[in-house]
Amino acid sequence: MYTNEDEKRLHAQAKALLTTPADGLEQIETLRDIINYADWKYYVQDEPVFADEEYDKLFKQLKHLEDKYPEHITADSPTRRVAMGLSEKFPAVSHLVPMLSLDNTYNAEDLRDWDKRCKDYAGTDNIEYCVEPKYDGASISLIYENGKLTRAATRGDGIMGEEITINAKMIRTLPLSAHFDKEGITQVEIRGEVVIHKKVFAEYNEQRAAQGLAPLANPRNAASGTLRILDPQEVRRRKLSAIVYHISDYTLTGEKPKSLNSHYGSLEWLYNLGFPTPVKEMKVFKTIDEVIQFCDEFETKRDDLPFEVDGLVVKVNSFEMQEKMGMTSHHPRWAVAYKFKARQATSKLLRVEFQVGRTGSITPVAKIEPVPIGGVTVTSISLFNEDVVREKDLHIGDTVLVERAGDVIPYIVKPLAELRTGQEKKI
């Protein structure tokens, strides 16, 4: 779909726009091209080419220009949809309700701006907010009919996903049946996140290292990749977990239960039905200042959680108010993600040094241009063994994607081979 020259051009344009943000009409199309390319690499090729924060900055630039020049908004703009493309491994199915993205915030000022917009949309200053962890995994949609789990699907492009029902049934934390009938519900669609416990992930990487395989970069990639394995028993062996965080649709035979009047109430109800929900970590607040204080405090505790989180999600608690506020084609107006400091960045591979251990084992160590990630400046990264170097196809001079998650040591996720100029040297 994209030639090497296309990829180099798009990366160069993205780098320029990240340095000097766009402000002119002529840059709208460039931003659309960059974001469409990034989406294709992420959702279709499973190869993210930008750090999350870089992508969000580019997306916000496009949104800013389209707000400034609304007459130039096109139906195929990335802001009009969620993502693109599907794998052909699993059958495609339609979500009952589109799985939209979340708008992102990064600081107190962003949250206060969102609070003002919420009050404008809701027509009142009296808004209760629910705050919960934003788990860093793979999103799924679950359908229960007459109390039985009948379908599970990946997020896909937000409209269509890949059916992974058999694999989802291998996740021990997901009930195969639940008593929705007690509230007169015959069909329900639930949203959740598939994750891997930090200890399970560390053990799995130890097993891979013992087999001479490269460690997986992060739990998110491990969860996403595992869901799409064709062998359900292998899925079972990898010990995935799931956390559900939203009821997107339901069919009632009687009156609506009180538990479905609020977001917090609905997750508390699901928890009592046997579903893993974030009720123990969730908090409800009456002011945005309380929300901001909680966000600041929670970020310092993120590494204490058993699963990786990359932020918090703030939602209007009242379902009635959510319905009144509505949504855009990209995200609900009643929810926003508060993103923690980035733990992923790009750098340049300067050289590889070989260190000899006490037992005589030789470990290759990558030396990179200093880059701050998660509050730490990273300059050296272990490559574990020669097999990892070969598997990742690293070259001196490569631009590399580096990640540091929780207390895990930094990884080189991969080289950005599309940026090679021909001057790089194979290790």
Name each model feature, range by range.
Residues 1-427:
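RNA/tRNA-interacting regions in translation and RNA-turnover enzymes
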